[in-house]
């Protein structure tokens, strides 16, 4: 028990040291941004993110720095990751939309249905569906134990059943989008999509910095993508940042 307690104290102490280091690095990155050293600031933010310390604020600042440095694709990727963590943050959504409007060429756009689904995170939809299910289950048990309550609980039970069905259906859609779909954001000035996953293949189309493409397939260090106009081609992975479904 004493060894366990000592180990716990060591972990807490190490965690506090890590938090202090992150806070210091974050302040240093903010100073670089304030001084107009946007590329250096973006690198500093990314170094913190690579330690596993993820937050929407950190990603948002990183995205701002990337945009100021002229890196549209990297900015969009960081904004998208920040939006994934805080989907109802109006400032993140506004900045993302602003940068997306700077992108040239065909790019995929989020439709209204996806935008509505994105108002909650995948975990929040999961909690909503689970909460509705257990509330319905509790009401059904209460009706069995106390039959006299049945008339008063009938309407409420119908409502919770409807909520359970609806939230479960939405959760299924979110799960399909979250686990089965990906978006690739072009992070180079120009990326030539080819008809096959090799350099000698014929050019299919050209995507500009910041273009968002649907990921269709993968082969070695190549991904097959489709742009907003429906054109399909293969791009080297090094020219894009692949994001999971929202």
Where are these regions (language model features)?
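Membrane-embedded alpha-helical segments of integral membrane proteins
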Residues: 105-145
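Beta-loop motif signature
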Residues: 34, 186-215, 219-221, 239
